[in-house]
Structures are given as structure tokens and as C-alpha cells.
Design a protein with these regions (language model features):
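Glycine-rich phosphate/diphosphate-binding loop of Rossmann-like nucleotide-binding domains
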Residues: 1-29, 41-44
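Alpha-helix capping and helix-loop boundary segments enriched in small/acidic/polar residues
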Residues: 2, 97-98, 141, 145
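Glycine-rich phosphate/nucleotide-binding loop
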Residues: 33-135
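Glycine-rich phosphate/pyrophosphate-binding loop and the adjoining helix
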Residues: 119, 123, 127-158
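Short Asp/Glu-rich motifs
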Residues: 3-4, 35, 130, 150
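Short alpha-helical patches at coil-to-helix transitions and adjacent helical residues
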Residues: 4, 8, 100-104, 147
Length: 158
């Protein structure tokens, strides 16, 4: 609880610098329920790493897989880190079954957030959406495409 109290204190101090942003505190168990039952009520969730990991994994039930979820860890003064929410997924490494969408969308997020390249980010997102609309799906989405096939299809739709 001590770290949660410190987190709340720092969040309240930082929030004062952003008067155009509404700060709302919510316990993680309540946030987890709302994230699943009414995800549109959240714009941005800011939390410490442990709760962020829990909430991001739980939110994967919305699209049905971690394989389509990008993530970013932003730094106030240094570079940001962009990666698939599932991390390196060592249990499926080298098997050709990983869904590349989360990595590809992480690149789109990087283009937009770190480089201001909105047009490039939108091109990538459109290519991913078009590929999914065409019914090209990896196994985690109920399809048959392997990692290389999904990547090639997205590239073809750029």
C-alpha cells in the first residue's frame, strides 16, 4: 500500500500541471471490471508497472488475443519503448505462429507518438485493418496464416 500512496501523491502533483486533463483515481480491481464491461470510458490509463501489466493482459480479452495489442512506455525526458504487449513470447519463438500485428502496430504507435508521422502510422493501421477484413488471420485469431504470411499480407496492403 505504501507504493500506491506514493503513486497517488505523485499523480496528483503532476496532474496540477495539466489542467485540461481530468484525473480520476480508481482501484485496480474496479478498473479491471470497467475495462472489460465499458472500455470506451477510458481514454488513457496511467498506472504503476504491476497494475499496468495486469490490466493490459486482462484487456486482451477484448480483441481475443494479446497478438494484436501494441504498447508503449513513455519517458518524460528520454526515449520511449515500443513493443508488443506480450513481450518476446519465448514459448512460441521460432515456430512461425506468432501474430506480428502487435509488433507492427507498435511501430505505427512509435511513428505517431515519437516522430509525429501520423500519415505513416495511419497507413500501417489501414493495412492491418484491411488484412483482417480480408479474412487473413493468424491461429490466435482463428485463422491459418503463419507469421510470415500475415506479415506479407500486411505489407501487400500498404
Amino acid at each position: 500500500m505504501a507504493t500506491s500512496k506514493l503513486w497517488r501523491q505523485i499523480a496528483e502533483e503532476v496532474a496540477k500541471e495539466y489542467s485540461d486533463v481530468t484525473l480520476e483515481h480508481q482501484l485496480v480491481d474496479s478498473a479491471a471490471m470497467v475495462m472489460i464491461t465499458n472500455p470506451a470510458c477510458f481514454d488513457v490509463v496511467v498506472t504503476e508497472n504491476l497494475f499496468g501489466d495486469i490490466l493490459s493482459d486482462e484487456s486482451s480479452v477484448l480483441p481475443g488475443t494479446l497478438g494484436v495489442m501494441p504498447s508503449a512506455s513513455h519517458s518524460e525526458s528520454g526515449p520511449s519503448l515500443y513493443e508488443p504487449i506480450h513481450g518476446s513470447a519465448p514459448d512460441i519463438a521460432g515456430k512461425g505462429i506468432a501474430n506480428p500485428i502487435s509488433m507492427i502496430l507498435s511501430v505505427a504507435m512509435m511513428l505517431r507518438d515519437s516522430f509525429g508521422e501520423t500519415a505513416g502510422a495511419e497507413m500501417i493501421e489501414h493495412a492491418v485493418n484491411k488484412t483482417l477484413t480480408q479474412g487473413i488471420l493468424t491461429r490466435d485469431l482463428g485463422g491459418l496464416a503463419n507469421t510470415k504470411q500475415m506479415t506479407a499480407a500486411i505489407i501487400a496492403n500498404l
